Amino acid sequence: MAAAGSLERSFVELSGAERERPRHFREFTVCDIGTASAAFGTVKYSESAGGFYYVESGKLFSITRNRFIHWKTSGDTLELVEESLDLNLLNNAVRLKFQNYNILPGGVHVSETQNHVIILILTNQTVHRLILPHPSRMYRSELVTESQMQSIFTDIGKVDFRDPCNSQLIPSVPGLSPGSTTSAAWLSSDGEALFALPSASGGIFVLKLPPYDVPGIASVVELKQSSVMQRLLTGWMPTAIRGDHGPSDRALSLAVHCVEHDAFIFALCQDHKLRMWSYKDQMCLMVADMLEYVPVNKDLRLTAGTGHKLRLAYSPSMGLYLGIYMHAPKRGQFCVFQLVSTENNRYSLDHISSLFTSQETLVDFALTSTDIWALWHDAENQTIVKYINFEHNVAGQWNPVFMQPLPEEEIVIRDDQDPREMYLRSLFTPGHFINAALCKALQIFCRGTERNLDLSWNELKKEITLAVENELQGSVTEYEFSQDEFRTLQQEFWCKFYACVLQYQEALSHPLALHLNPVTNMVCLLKKGYLSFLVPSSLVDHLYLLPDEHLLTEDETTISDDADVARDVLCLIKCLRMIGESVTMDMAVLMETSCYNLQSPEKAAEHILEDLITIDVENVMEDICSKLQEIRNPVHAIGLLIREMDYETEVEMEKGFDPAQPLNVRMNLSQLYGSSTAGYIVCRGVYKIASTRFLICRDLLILQQLLTRLGDAVILGAGQLFQAQQDLLHRTAPLLLSYYLIKWASQCLATDVPVDTLESNLQHLSVLELTDSGALMANKLVSSPQTIMELFFQEVARKQIISHLFSQPKAPLSQTGLNWPEMITAVTGYLLQLLWPSNPGCLFLECLMGNCQYVQLQDYIQLLHPWCQVNVGSCRFMLGRCYLVTGEVQKALECFCQAASEVGKEEFLDRLIRSEDGEIVSTPKLQYYDKVLRLLDVVGLPELVIQLATSAITEAGDDWKSQATLRTCIFKHHLDLGHNSQAYEALTQIPDSSRQLDCLRQLVVVLCERSQLQDLVEFPYVNLHNEVVGIIESRARAVDLMTHNYYELLYAFHIYRHNYRKAGTVMFEYGMRLGREVRTLRGLEKQGNCYLAAINCLRLIRPEYAWIVQPASGAVSDRPGASPKRNHDGECTAAPTNRQIEILELEDLEKEYSLARIRLTLARHDPSVIAIAGSSSAKEMSALLVQAGLFDTAISLCQTFTLPLTPVFEGLAFKCIKLQFGGEAAQGEAWSWLATNQLSSVITTKESSATDEAWRLLSTYLERYKVQNNLYHHCVINKLLSHGVPLPNWLINSYKKVDAAELLRLYLNYDLLEEAVDLVSEYVDAVLGKGHQYFGIEFPLSATAPMVWLPYSSIDQLLQALGENSANSHNIILSQKILDKLEDYQQKVDKATRDLLYRRDL
């Protein structure tokens, strides 16, 4: 059908009705501007409508591209709407109510200037001028990037409707025709607003408003013949002068054509004559009798014209055309003329064509320089639209427009169907009913109950359901009735509501006018309740829908260059039409049901054929067989028809705009047909094509079944029969199913998607790296009544199609004009190509997935899967995503696995596995598995991740990197699930040592955090023992000691493996760190336990092996992550190059344990020292213990570590001093530390004080801990004397007994001369035998006893000290006392010496 381009095809009506909330009109009242004639106030006019197109609406880069205004008038109300096919206009609908005035039919005229859009309005008493901004002046930039913009009506509220400059009463001048409804208005070249009205005498009244920005007053002029000569020249004389009884010459229809500084006013009058006036010259330039062009005009000449209409069309190249409709009873005639000008300002009409029609009531017609479009409304309330090319159509054959029929009057409901569900499905099926009809029916059905009718599609459905159910229940009088009775009652009320809606739908579908844009050739039908668009039919649809009489006269050469082929196709179409007309409703439902239930269409067709043959009472099948015999080559004809309907293509459409195009061009093109209206129209066009083609394919299947039945009759040979059965039949069925699927998609509503669901979906798609695929919506909620096809067109397909259309323009884009029939045909064709199931791309499915339409996607794939083997893997993948969302995870996994087999064969899957940098790192299947695993991970399905990764391992084969990745993945998710054994097993199978070590580290950390230490310890760690020890050690040294128990874990690890020495080493290191880093009581407690555990470990080893290596300083200070050590200048200190190894034996550990216990004792007694006790040495601890009064503990510590007890005694002596001179507070505090030291006996007398107890404790220690040189006595006395404390007698006596000479020296050191004198005296007496036992002298001086001695040096020092102050008499006495004692001593010594010598001599 290559020659089909020259065919004048039929058009199809596509409703552009709003399905969402009713259009929101902003209402304004135009108040009464003065007193006018009361006679006009009662005039009622019929509803009318009209439209205006912008001059540059067809330019590709114009701000007014695809933009137009349409309006409707009804009584005193004018509704104005601005539409755009590219953008959603805001505030684009206004309703003006004219107080006390009615708007004339056709009394709205719109003009545009460079800066303004000016609306001129005529009512029965006034004229008005509305001045609005031009779209080109509303935006600073020509490049509009938003998807919506403000309408020119946005600021109409600022207009002063009573401004006398723009509103004027029509003066009550004589001769103004009171009953006339025609009018005209225009803008002069000077900006004046001119309004033309017919006069009763046949002239024209013109009311002029000065330019809006120039002061002035309104004026009125009447155009009439001013001289008899002019009347004779023009052949016109007013009726009153003629005096005959012929028809009046009052104008029935006015039209204006502006030329430079003049305006021609054309008036088609009741006397069937056309008059042309010059406004500038105020004279009639031409009169033409239209009856001259009417074949039978005798009756018309005597009667006044009533339904004549006049239209103008101007072409810069061809001039001005006039279209005249001459109305006559039961017939009508169109005459087309061209205005011809001659010299001397004389004009004539050149008759171009006369076209006849049998339709009676012409509602409106539109004229272009080539075509006439006509709108009729017949007696059966049917709307009829036709068009004709008046230049080339010699036969006068009108081309039909297939109007959108009203929904079925009755809905057939089977017994197994719910009436409410079926009626709601019909009421809310996209394209069936408009929102306004549903709202009006709801209002009536509720008997005027106040209801909020500003409802969304879903809200309206709920309200209707509630209203009908309430009405039903209100009518029930009986409490009990059968289910059948209830069903009958339910069906009755739903049928009643449905009939009400149907009635309003019919009323709102009443046609009012045609709106034709000659720039773009777009034709719209303005109806009472909505707007519809007329689009051309495809060749196949045109032939199938064409009435029989048109099909018979169809030019065969336009179908094919081969006349025989063309005749065969026409005969085939005729046969299909005959089958289609014979198919009953039940048969049609059978085929639809078979497609929906995934049953064989061929079998359904065979069943329908059998039913057709069975019920064929009018011998239709015989007629079809007879008609088939006229087809010379049925196989070729059927193949030609199938090819024409098949949109399968091997080449995928380009994605995105050509980057070589400038940004402003790409941005501008990206908005073409971007409005919701355009999207709806395009998708309705696709639905119309799919519906028609579905019927064609259905009838074709039935016909092929018939051909099969006929067998090798005269029609087909055996070879052809086989071909028809095997080839054509199997090609037709997928075609039918494809169109069924597209038809289903065009009626399947998209669902609302919450923002959080969209965000979650976006996260999943970002994991798959599909967020830039173009199949995603721009973060907005899906409109409730939007179909999934509209969603796809708006979000994805539109940009693809537009970029494809303008990728290789035939002319520069700036010069490209938009032709609506061509564009809508191309756009619907490419959209069908993108939707075609067997084409390689699957953008439609991807769009549904990207926009969270999961239920619809599942249904679509279910309808597609059994018969379409294209994109199988992509479908399985997307179905898997749907199952993920619905929670059917095993089904999802199964789908993902099935899709893997198609990787590398399908475009979507190839794009899915393509990495961002384009680098192929593994096989395609492994890349696919990686993406799916990441998706499952993000969704949070570890079980599925494990299963899929396990399956993918087989695919990995010898690829050790992929093996490592997959096994790591398995390990990770087993670990997350708490499958510790499986996680360890997976860990051991990772071939990459680096990954294995990372996983091992993770295993250790996670099991520690979960406190699942038994598993961690008991795993065998074959070939991983050192690694796990190293990991635990590094973790132990890197983390906080009190919140993590890695040391204890490592201890258990070694104990479990009987490695006691390492276990002891671990616990010893743990204890060391606790002391240094954990300055708490709990830390000290743990430190003791650690050392005790280390001791136990060494005791389990044979003595010769019971040792450990002192943990190096690096175990504590050089840990990973520790900050570098610096000197006082801030520079890093160099690490020591060599370290000495220190061996610790059991004894050393016992000492450390003892020290740890002592630390704990001290900490419990005095918490303030906790911070320093933990890391203190034994010597430091001794001082701390003494300071705290824990003298028993201090002595024990000193003995353990072989430390001198001197600090202990000094400390106790000091405390005694403090108590000696302290107050009550000191006494009270002393009891606490005294209680911690065990005294030899308890003194229970009340007289005993803390001071006494302290001295007694000191005395006890001195008696208990004796040393060879009496060091402790010395240090205690020294301490006391240094603080000026008198020595207690017991201490003096105690020290005298052990070292009186040292006591003397101490007295001398502290200048205690009198005490020294007393001591010397007593000492000399003791030596001489008087009280010798108090000085520890066993044998006093005698000849038989051992030798005795006196500390002469100290005595000499004493005498010297006493003699230094000779003025002190007391000193002299003391000195003399000593000298006397010494003299006495010397005498006795001398005597004893002699006795000794005597004895020796014997």
From Swiss-Prot:
GO terms for cellular component: nuclear envelope; nuclear pore; nuclear pore outer ring. One of its GO terms (molecular function) is structural constituent of nuclear pore. Pfam families: Beta-prop_Nup120_160, NUP160_helical, TPR_NUP160_120_M, TPR_Nup160_C. GO terms for biological process: mRNA export from nucleus; nucleocytoplasmic transport; protein transport. The modification Phosphoserine is found at residues 10, 456, 915, 1123. Its main location: nucleus. It is found in: Nucleus, Nuclear pore complex. It comes from the Eukaryota. Keywords: mRNA transport, Nuclear pore complex, Nucleus, Phosphoprotein, Protein transport, Translocation, Transport. The keyword Transmembrane does not apply. The keyword Nucleus applies. Disulfide bonds: none annotated. Part of the nuclear pore complex (NPC). Forms part of the NUP160 subcomplex in the nuclear pore which is composed of NUP160, NUP133, NUP107 and NUP96. This complex plays a role in RNA export and in tethering NUP98 and NUP153 to the nucleus. Functions as a component of the nuclear pore complex (NPC). Involved in poly(A)+ RNA transport. This is Nuclear pore complex protein Nup160. It comes from Mus musculus (Mouse). The gene is Nup160.
